[in-house]
Amino acid sequence: MKISAILTVALSMALLSNAAPLEKRRFGQEHSAFVEPLYQKMRDSAQGTNFAGQVGQMSGEAVNALLAAKPACRQQVVADHLVFFAKKMGADTTIADGKTREKDLINIAKQYRTAERNTNQDGKPSFLCGRKPSFKELNGIVQKQDPAATTKPDTPTDATNLDETFDPL
């Protein structure tokens, strides 16, 4: 009985040690050295204003939007929301440095929009968003791609789903 248990454990360990993933995956882009400071800058840009909670929530959603399983337009939607809140801060006369904060947050949104997204496979490009941004400041900006990608990025047919349209609520 003891020998069969020992053999079972030994065989299981041997099999597990030889197991390897079928595909190398490219994860971790949502916490890269490029984007991590942007999340803090997002929060800092609205600190002390009536928009701190909303922009803080967007900084959390910004992390989520870079995940491989998220829809192709989620990153652009977050950037659109950041520009929306930036313009609101710039127009708010109770914020002494509102125009400066507006400019700063728009620049942060532009930088964020260029951030590389995770992909389900190393060397595979992430999907592009198939709709125009809601604000002209983001026109022509798309996310960076995996430098090891050997194909061009696709635009999925579901990139314009209603749940991915800009809605500032």
Predicted features, each with a name:
Residues M1-F27:
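Fungal secretory targeting signals
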Residues K24-L169:
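Mature extracellular/secreted ectodomains of secretory-pathway proteins
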